[in-house]
Amino acid sequence: MITQRQKDILNLIVELFTKTHEPIGSKTLQNSIASSSATIRNDMAALEKLGLLEKAHTSSGRLPSQEGFRYFVEHSLNPDSLDEQDVYQVIKAFDFEAFRLGDLLQRASDVLANLTGYTALILDVEPKKQRLTTFDIVKLSNHDALAVLTLDEASPVTVQFAIPKNFLDSDLMTVAKIARERFLNQTVLDIHYRLRTELPQIIQKYFPRTDNVLDLFDHIFNPIFQEEVFISGKIKTLEFAGLNTYQFLENLQSVALEIRQSLPEDELHRVQVADSKEKSLADLTVISQKFLIPYRGFGILTVIGPVDLDYQRTISLINVISRVLAVKLGDFYRYLNSNHYEVH
């Protein structure tokens, strides 16, 4: 347990260090702490013994340890402390007309990366929890067709495909019939299971040759099994992390899995200070927060940066962006209706 003065000293050192990245001495702290330099030095020594501060190699000053940053995040952070200029920049950035859901999510990722200077990711609603509400196949020509899948009433996905050479129009209708009977109102997780277990036997009843039909179903439904991930500032990881981290971020499905596993369902936000189980992120800070996607569930905003990032500003930015984004998404979904399709 630390005293209030020691807590104030730690908070001030974290605040100053994240702005200057220079060791902080007792004389610097005297301007804000109403105590003598000797008293402040004693408190700094006590904080060092507790593992919250570290000695600098090049000066007599101190800097926060990983435990010190964690303590600050858990006990002193004020996520509702917002800078007016940051709020203005966020609102201004979202002052545009979005034609697709992805436009808003990508803009959020871009704004978060630009204002923090770190890597930002936005995750859409987790695929496995969504339900298939409509399914249609539209024939475009004699050679290709379009499958239209709607998830949770407001997230249409289209998949264009080449019609198998041995297919008649009635065969396309049969594919649509099977999909509706077996998959409508089922979760994406259930659909994935049924594609592997029930579907092969069902198709045998309708088609003499099943290989290309199974491949067609896989092609049509594969997009809804993939995470929607919007990333910005990936190149910035090379400034504060190694090549391994950059390469890890190349595989967005693995990144999405790591983010979801690190943020339990019953938590809205989490700050990992050099605490990730993923080796490529183990020496970094990963900040994740859920945000509301109206009518569908929750997405996730994530920032990946160095341990000595500015926690107060970064988390405040995540807060304001999540709020503005939720409002914009609400407006977008109120406008959207069943006749609007997202074409991929």
Swiss-Prot record:
Keyword Signal included in the entry's annotation: no
One GO term of the biological process aspect: negative regulation of DNA-templated transcription
Pfam families referenced in this protein's UniProt entry, alphabetically: HrcA (PF01628), HrcA_DNA-bdg (PF03444)
UniProt keyword Transcription present: yes
A Gene Ontology molecular function term of the record: DNA binding
Keywords, in A-Z order: Repressor, Stress response, Transcription, Transcription regulation
Job of this protein: Negative regulator of class I heat shock genes (grpE-dnaK-dnaJ and groELS operons). Prevents heat-shock induction of these operons.
Family as reported in the entry's similarity comment: Belongs to the HrcA family.
Protein name in the entry: Heat-inducible transcription repressor HrcA
Natural source organism: Streptococcus mutans serotype c (strain ATCC 700610 / UA159)
